[in-house]
Amino acid sequence: MQIKRLIEKIPGGMMLVPLFLGALCHTFSPGAGKYFGSFTNGMITGTVPILAVWFFCMGASIKLSATGTVLRKSGTLVVTKIAVAWVVAAIASRIIPEHGVEVGFFAGLSTLALVAAMDMTNGGLYASIMQQYGTKEEAGAFVLMSLESGPLMTMIILGTAGIASFEPHVFVGAVLPFLVGFALGNLDPELREFFSKAVQTLIPFFAFALGNTIDLTVIAQTGLLGILLGVAVIIVTGIPLIIADKLIGGGDGTAGIAASSSAGAAVATPVLIAEMVPAFKPMAPAATSLVATAVIVTSILVPILTSIWSRKVKARAAKIEILGTVK
């Protein structure tokens, strides 16, 4: 049976299918982990330790050396995305109630959900899109996008926007596995190759554990809102990313659209933030559901929109070239 190939036909399938299976488990048998105990309970409830190992391996996979073009492109996209998420957080914190919207169509929406959905780019999706529609340097710009993975950037945004406060040691704790992995991976290429293989392997495991924190009734309640959140992520982050790519990154805007997605790792952010700041715990389940839906929506729409944009840009460039030749 070609199970893996079937799962990968779904956008973000290796993340979303185990997530859904975990949610099924939690919805219909919430006490399964405690009942079975031991290793089974560890797989069901081990979101944080599994993610800690994943962050370590992610750090180890990043190469310190990169060309100036790659760093400029990557830095432009990462900084722009984070800056937009910060602005959204600052505005949302003045409009949305402290504990999120609790009634009506927007029930479940919180500043935590907005920031988690907007501050991370799906690096793998970006790289695959730009390999088709961009240059090698543009495709390689995903190198710094890995720095967005994990709760650190979300913590910085929430902290600097005055929405939450984190002790310095909490910041260190959040980024330490990543930094240790990064150091080891760059000190020894063989270690980088060894640990980087686990990045993709661990995704289904932390996704399943994460799914076991989600009640499917919450997803049913936030489904349409999650779709709208996904569209909002593309519009709100995509426009500034296109502008930044043109003005600073030296591109034609294609990379900007390709970077306007939500990363699969963002689904874990609400739960991780809630572990550090208990005040966010009531919002975490709904925020996780919203972000998961946004990940699906952006994974489907971003490649389509990038393709349309790229064709129009190339057609315009060809037309200008023809006119220039005629003159």
Swiss-Prot record:
It is a multi-pass membrane protein. It comes from the Bacteria. It is found in: Cell inner membrane. It catalyses: 2-dehydro-3-deoxy-D-gluconate(in) + H(+)(in) = 2-dehydro-3-deoxy-D-gluconate(out) + H(+)(out). Keywords: Cell inner membrane, Cell membrane, Membrane, Sugar transport, Symport, Transmembrane, Transmembrane helix, Transport. Its main location: membrane. The keyword Ligase does not apply. The chain crosses the membrane at residues 10-30, 42-62, 73-93, 95-115, 139-159, 163-183, 199-219, 224-244, 254-274, 289-309. GO terms for molecular function: 2-keto-3-deoxygluconate:proton symporter activity. Pfam families: KdgT. GO terms for cellular component: plasma membrane. InterPro entries: 2keto-3dGluconate_permease (IPR004684), 2keto-3dGluconate_permease_sub (IPR018395). Catalyzes the proton-dependent uptake of 2-keto-3-deoxygluconate (KDG) into the cell. Belongs to the KdgT transporter family. NCBIfam families: kdgT. This is 2-keto-3-deoxygluconate permease. It comes from Escherichia coli O157:H7. The gene is kdgT.
